[in-house]
Amino acid sequence: MEYLNSPFWQRQPFFPLEIQRFLRTRFEKALHDPLDRQHLVWPLILGSPGILKNFTKGIPTEELLVQAAKMLAAVEIKEPSISWHYHQELFPDTASMQEVGWVPHVSWRAWAPMVSLRIGWQLSSLTGIDPGVDYLFKCGISLFNNGLYFECHDALEPLWLNARGEEKANLQSLILLAAGFHHIQHQNSAGAQSVWKDALTRLNGRGRFTLSMGKLEIDESLRISSLIVSELDSVNGIDWGKIWQLPKPRWNLV
């Protein structure tokens, strides 16, 4: 599912390595098996600012299951209690029991609201995408359009590894395009220019191309990236505020 607005089209913080691992282990499972999108639901709820505020001594199991039910149903999981036990077995570092209920595990508790926000957008990006041969491709597009460029890279990389010829080159260019926007989110101009140097040269004038998974329009994202590169090369210094006023780039499957 894609949204016009995204909290990620602005400068983003750096997560500590342990938080990056926490996010990535759950997200990679969701990419590997669509049914494992369920593992994004639990930290999303536990780290939610509203839950943390309303359940200061922990959210009771019964309430946790109620909160999870609709999100789980949207990814074809019908039994919240079974999903919760399955998640706890795989990821014992998600939650700890306190006085009356569950709280985020100490390993990510300090970052809970930000982790919940990112995981929530990961889940929203993957929800509504049918399992099938083009699952990863459609996930990559949705993630890109929601400003989750690092996750877009992770979705497209397996396709690139298995591709051949022109398709492999096209996928590599898409991955590098997404990687450049990821660097921009951290205001790393050198990183963006490095990965975009090859990608923008390869994609120059190619606003639409055909892959085995479908036809993709990327001209809007190419236009935005070109405007950003011009700003990065400005002799007057980089105006990051000007960059963040640009429209959020997007890809369109046609």
Give the role of each language-model region:
Residues 1-150, 158-162, 206-254:
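N-terminal alpha-helical interaction modules that lie
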Residues 147-151, 163-172, 184-192:
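Alpha-helix boundary/capping segments in eukaryotic regulatory proteins
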Residues 153-154, 193-197, 219:
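Conserved positions within tetratricopeptide repeat
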Residues 154-176, 201-211:
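Short, charge-rich amphipathic alpha-helical segments embedded
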Residues 189-207:
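TPR/TPR-like (Sel1-like) alpha-helical repeat modules
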